[in-house]
Amino acid sequence: MTNPPSTDYSRAGAGLRIGVLALQGDFREHLRAAEATGATGIGIRRPSELDGIDGLIIPGGESTAIDKLARAFELADPLRKLIAEGLPVYGSCAGMILLADEIADPATDLAGNPQQTFGGLDITVRRNAFGRQRESFEIDLEFKGLGFSDTGSGVAPVHAVFIRGPWVERVGPGVEVLAQVEPADPAHASHAAALQGTARIVAVRSGHLLATSFHPEVTGEKRVHELFIRMIRGEA
């Protein structure tokens, strides 16, 4: 039986060391979000900084750049090892791509080699699925497993920001779908055509791994990070 979600976000992460992969992207926002829970946030740029962390966040940004930099800084293999060993990891946007076992449309380098991922999530993702930067959008989503809203009015939808976000095209049998964008949602012109009448998966969990297509760190939405804290503590 899991413990109920806490409403005291400022203490939820007390005593935990949360690493944030700080090679590229919006890692500063994730560090602030982790520290807002009372955790110690640690920017990860070299393998030695992985020692002693309780969980890791892979931020949004450019998945191809993070992939190349992780290999250049000799972080890719240590990260794969930690993920395989059960380290709790949360990936947002590019982080979702990097946690996926498969990319439907991988980028390639000049030699034609496809981008690599750290893997761990039995999912197939499509990069930039909702369109380009100018087609970014915001929407309210129902999200399974979150704590109560700050207003105390019950579990409120997540206000999600999508910035060149991926979506999940396939989930394996051990993957739980936490949120999806529905065709019946408000018809933002920026993503209505992309949906083509099909619900698109934008948040998933499999055991110790959590991923979202969107960016809770840029909206002040605390509950996704709080869910990750509860996962680290074994409470969710």
Swiss-Prot record:
Keywords assigned by UniProt? Glutamine amidotransferase, Hydrolase, Lyase, Pyridoxal phosphate
Which species expresses this protein natively? Arthrobacter sp. (strain FB24)
Q: State whether it acts alone or in a complex, and with which partners, per the record.
A: In the presence of PdxS, forms a dodecamer of heterodimers. Only shows activity in the heterodimer.
User: Which family is this protein grouped under?
Assistant: Belongs to the glutaminase PdxT/SNO family.
| Protein name listed in UniProt | Pyridoxal 5'-phosphate synthase subunit PdxT
Read off the Pfam families from this record: SNO (PF01174)
The gene it comes from is pdxT
Asked whether the keyword Hydrolase is assigned, the reply is yes
What does this protein's UniProt record list under function? Catalyzes the hydrolysis of glutamine to glutamate and ammonia as part of the biosynthesis of pyridoxal 5'-phosphate. The resulting ammonia molecule is channeled to the active site of PdxS.
- EC number(s) in its UniProt entry? 4.3.3.6, 3.5.1.2
A GO term for molecular function: glutaminase activity
Could you name the Gene Ontology cellular component terms for this entry?
cytosol; glutaminase complex
Pathway per its UniProt entry is: Cofactor biosynthesis; pyridoxal 5'-phosphate biosynthesis
- Reaction equation(s) it catalyzes: aldehydo-D-ribose 5-phosphate + D-glyceraldehyde 3-phosphate + L-glutamine = pyridoxal 5'-phosphate + L-glutamate + phosphate + 3 H2O + H(+); L-glutamine + H2O = L-glutamate + NH4(+)
Q: Where is the active site?
A: C93, H215, E217
Q: Organism classification, top ranks?
A: Bacteria, Bacillati, Actinomycetota, Actinomycetes, Micrococcales
Gene Ontology biological process terms, A to Z: glutamine catabolic process; pyridoxal phosphate biosynthetic process; pyridoxine metabolic process
